Amino acid sequence: MLSREDFYMIKQMRHEGAYIVDIATQIGCSERTVRRYLKYPEPPARKTRHKMVKLKPFMDYIDMRLAENVWNSEVIFAEIKAMGYTGGRSMLRYYIQPKRKMRPSKRTVRFETQPGYQLQHDWGEVEVEVAGQRCKVNFAVNTLGFSRSFHVFAAPKHDAEHTYESLVRAFRYFGGCVKTVLVDNQKAAVLKNNNGKVVFNSGFLLLADHYNFLPRACRPRRARTKGKVERMVKYLKENFFVRYRRFDSFTHVNQQLEQWIADVADKRELRQFKETPEQRSRWSRNICSVTGYRLRYQLLRYPPCVLGQLYRGWW
């Protein structure tokens, strides 16, 4: 950084008509520096250096805690304060800041699956107008891991039966089932997930057994493992539900969704593959074929005279 005297000399020489190259030679700096200083109305203030005298006795301890992946300055501040540190928090933050580039990255390595192997499931919600009234629309997104094709099912509730119906509809839409279905830790699918020991909802296991897929749950607080479907939830909110805000009914919502997926979403180019989901879907023809599945709450749609036959057939 140049001194105040250099700053005023640059201004004076330029005012007298000196060329920038001559000013740079006289001052002993680059032409780029001269141009930068000419733009300043006042001499740039020097950055004050933090004195680390009070912190110096604790630097070895701080470095040890950083090596143990403890980067919370408040935690470290409380620890060194108990050890006799009398300085402030800002001094500690100033010391830690340039070391943060050494912090291990939390970036998730993208895991690409084979065609017909994995489907990722997630829910989103948005407020729109249905039948003339503002209401919350829950929508389940089921995304094929390989092709990035997805199916969306809008429903008034985000419960177990609508979760299962969304998967049944997705399998029917894709023309078959996959080998694994990845879900988050919603109660409709997962009752408990403790250090990898997963207890699945019995209803979800019945669905998995019927379609012969392997249920899988994300690690708690690690939802990024199903990043493909989470990006689709955001994509829907920022695209479909921005363009379409009014619907006659939930049936109308789902009709519009399927039409929009066919016309727009399946034809978007995936930058990492230089292909569209529609093009990549040609490799997913080996997904397993499916048969129908009757949901518990669907029995309520039938009159009592046929419930007995449906009940026996369902089991």
From Swiss-Prot:
InterPro entries: HTH_IS21_transposase_type, Integrase_cat-core, RNaseH-like_sf, RNaseH_sf. One of its GO terms (biological process) is DNA recombination. One of its GO terms (molecular function) is DNA binding. PROSITE patterns: HTH_IS21, INTEGRASE. The keyword DNA-binding applies. Residues 5-66 form the HTH IS21-type domain. The keyword Coiled coil does not apply. Keywords: DNA recombination, DNA-binding, Transposable element, Transposition. It holds the Pfam family rve. Belongs to the transposase IS21/IS408/IS1162 family. PANTHER family: INTEGRASE PROTEIN, TRANSPOSASE RV3428C-RELATED. Involved in the transposition of the insertion sequence. NCBIfam families: transpos_IS21 (NF033546). This is Transposase for insertion sequence element IS640. It comes from Shigella sonnei. The gene is istA.
